[in-house]
């Protein structure tokens, strides 16, 4: 029974789509979140606190609320659609945008904490050695913040795989286009196909355990932030 579910053509397509979404989202989150985390970690100020609050908002905001407003923003009559010339709702690109916004705090916050834990001294030393700010960032800050980057990448990937409310609101669960594993589990439960739901839910439960274990091992080895 289990093999029949896992190796079903439709299930393999759903699995591939889910992994593709999580991978693309994680790459974009690291590319966008790392410089944002660096900026937030350098000093304070009202604007930085406002941006930090906006970044962390998806942690407490119900996914359906975020998904609802994203659906409106991506709809056919929205200013964003007029600007782009095409709508993002019910498309893979729309899922990526929604996933990046929804998972942003799970990537930015660990990286920001790693930069803060590093302190200003390593960058000051690099400056005395005549390293440019950009060189110092790539050769000093990023290596020392590696544990935060790893934790952020793991959290971002796992959180994207487990998304439900946002992806359902934005994507609608179209097979082969926007239907991911979490939506598939919901469909199985609605149709009373408990065996199939158990297989997928059990797999995601095991993945969540591995993610948390990996984070704990990283923190145990490197501490909560970067190496001193």
From Swiss-Prot:
Name the chain's protein. Molybdenum transport system permease protein ModB
Q: What does this protein do?
A: Part of the binding-protein-dependent transport system for molybdenum; probably responsible for the translocation of the substrate across the membrane.
Q: Which residues form a coiled coil?
A: none
* Main localization of the protein described in the UniProt heading: membrane
The UniProt gene name for this protein comes to modB
- Give the highest taxon in the source lineage: Bacteria
Family as reported in the entry's similarity comment: Belongs to the binding-protein-dependent transport system permease family. CysTW subfamily.
Kindly give the membrane topology term recorded for this protein. Answer: Multi-pass membrane protein
Q: What is the lineage of its organism?
A: Bacteria, Pseudomonadati, Pseudomonadota, Alphaproteobacteria, Rhodobacterales
Q: Where are the transmembrane segments?
A: 21-41, 54-74, 88-108, 133-153, 154-174, 198-218
CDD domains recorded: TM_PBP2
């Amino acid at each position: 029974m289990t093999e029949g579910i896992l190796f079903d053509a439709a299930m393999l397509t759903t699995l591939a789509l889910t992994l593709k979404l999580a991978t693309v989202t994680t790459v974009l989150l690291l590319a966008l979140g790392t410089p944002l985390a660096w900026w937030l970690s350098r000093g304070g100020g009202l604007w930085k606190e406002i941006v930090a609050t906006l970044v962390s908002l998806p942690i407490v905001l119900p996914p359906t609320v975020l998904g609802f407003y994203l659906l409106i923003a991506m709809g056919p009559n929205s200013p964003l659609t007029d600007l782009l010339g095409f709508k993002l709702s019910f498309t893979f690109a729309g899922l990526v945008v929604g996933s990046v916004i929804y998972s942003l705090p799970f990537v930015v916050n660990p990286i920001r904490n790693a930069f803060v834990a590093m302190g200003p001294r390593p960058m000051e030393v690099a400056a005395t050695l005549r390293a440019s700010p950009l060189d110092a960032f790539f050769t000093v800050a990023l290596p020392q913040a590696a544990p935060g980057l790893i934790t952020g990448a793991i959290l971002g990937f796992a959180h994207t795989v487990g998304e439900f409310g946002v992806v359902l609101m934005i994507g609608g669960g179209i097979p082969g286009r926007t239907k991911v594993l979490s939506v598939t589990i919901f469909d199985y439960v609605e149709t009373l196909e408990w065996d199939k739901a158990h297989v997928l839910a059990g797999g995601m439960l095991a993945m969540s355990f591995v993610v948390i274990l990996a984070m704990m091992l990283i923190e145990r080895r490197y501490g909560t932030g970067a190496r001193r």
